[in-house]
């Protein structure tokens, strides 16, 4: 009888330890992780830092808020909200782009892109990331599910580590934390 009690205690103890120390199978909500609250919002990651400021996706292209471009990528862009124009000064002249247009002027020469350069939603101005990239030393890549854009603007050395085996990337350290990706 005492052996049977020890076996039951061993099984219960083993189940408890298994439950306590085995990894969680819970997947984290990536929209919550990136702070996405609306369908057209795009999370912005600059140099591996997730920003609170969000971008928007229009016609399949990412657009950044003017303030985000000015504060994090290139402070030489100027948005005139009274005239609804975007200005950018180069040594050879000033670029001027009107809201809702795919054309811009440089020294009275009209040029065009295959996308709208600047859009507005209420009082917020959004600049096409492709246009920002033309005049800023950045690279970017967009990702789906959830929508996000990763921008690299710092070209220094990046510290990396080699992974020894396949494992899940978790939200916080520890096996009980929800995983972000497998």
Label for each model-derived stretch:
Residues 1-179:
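Primary recognition of N-terminal secretory signal peptides and signal-anchoring hydrophobic helices
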Residues 182:
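Conserved PDZ fold ligand-binding element
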């Amino acid at each position: 009888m005492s052996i049977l009690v020890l076996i039951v205690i061993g099984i219960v103890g083993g189940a408890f330890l298994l439950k306590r120390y085995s990894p969680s199978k819970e997947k984290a909500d990536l929209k919550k992780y990136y702070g996405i609250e609306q369908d057209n919002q795009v999370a912005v990651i600059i140099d591996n830092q997730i920003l609170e400021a969000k971008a928007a996706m229009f016609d399949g292209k990412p657009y950044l808020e003017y303030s985000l471009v000015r504060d994090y990528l290139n402070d030489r862009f100027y948005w005139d909200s009274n005239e609804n124009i975007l200005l950018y000064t180069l040594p050879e002249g000033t670029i001027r782009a009107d809201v809702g247009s795919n054309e811009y002027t440089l020294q009275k020469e009209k040029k065009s892109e295959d996308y709208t350069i600047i859009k507005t939603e209420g009082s917020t101005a959004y600049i096409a990331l492709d246009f920002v990239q033309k005049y800023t030393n950045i690279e970017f890549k967009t990702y789906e599910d959830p929508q996000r854009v990763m921008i690299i603007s710092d070209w220094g050395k990046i510290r990396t580590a080699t992974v020894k085996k396949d494992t899940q990337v978790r939200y916080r350290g520890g096996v009980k934390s929800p995983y972000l990706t497998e």
